[in-house]
Design a protein with these regions (language model features):
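Hydrophobic, membrane-interfacing alpha helices
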Residues: 1-171
Length: 171
């Protein structure tokens, strides 16, 4: 529904939408499995533990996915020419330049050859660290905290990173 409003497309699916649907439905599915198969076969899946596993896996998956974005040239950051002050100074020596006409940054925005904020790399690192922290918490018996940590980091960064991105996803 959100993608339909933002992108103005009648039939579209997004990763963000799938994550939202998964977070909302997964606990109910786990409880249904517990009530049916769990009762029949005498087992119980703790909801928080299963949700933590899903969230940690999602976090690592998104981290690896950003590397695919880097390769394809999508989900790109703003060009440094559009940045001012601290952001421009910080990314002057830490940026990415895309080349090749098959990169999305080239054919969608005409920004090939420009120094860009390396948002894909930053996101990959933040998510990988979050996944590792979540895994450590999980292995130490703090599944609930691992769930909250990975969900908060990925979703807060998803919002914050939008301020550093230049790719337009609506139309």
């Amino acid at each position: 529904i959100v993608a339909r409003i933002v992108e103005k497309k009648k039939a579209t699916l997004t990763i963000g939408g799938a994550v939202f649907a998964g977070v909302v439905t997964a606990p109910w599915i786990i409880m249904l499995v517990n009530a049916t198969l769990g009762t029949a076969f005498n087992f119980h899946l703790p909801v928080a533990v299963m949700m933590a596993c899903l969230s940690i896996g999602y976090t690592f998956g998104e981290s690896l996915g950003r590397l695919a974005c880097l390769s394809f040239g999508c989900c790109y950051g703003k060009p440094l020419s559009q940045c001012t002050g601290h952001a421009r100074k910080l990314f002057e020596h830490f940026n990415v330049v895309f080349t090749g006409e098959t990169k999305k940054v080239a054919y969608a925005s005409g920004l090939a050859g420009e120094k860009m904020i390396p948002i894909q790399i930053i996101t990959a690192v933040i998510y990988a660290i979050s996944g590792l922290v979540g895994t450590l918490l999980f292995l130490r018996g703090f599944a609930g905290i691992a769930l909250v940590e990975t969900l908060v980091v990925t979703q807060v960064w998803r919002v914050v990173s939008e301020f550093f991105r230049a790719d337009f996803r609506g139309e």
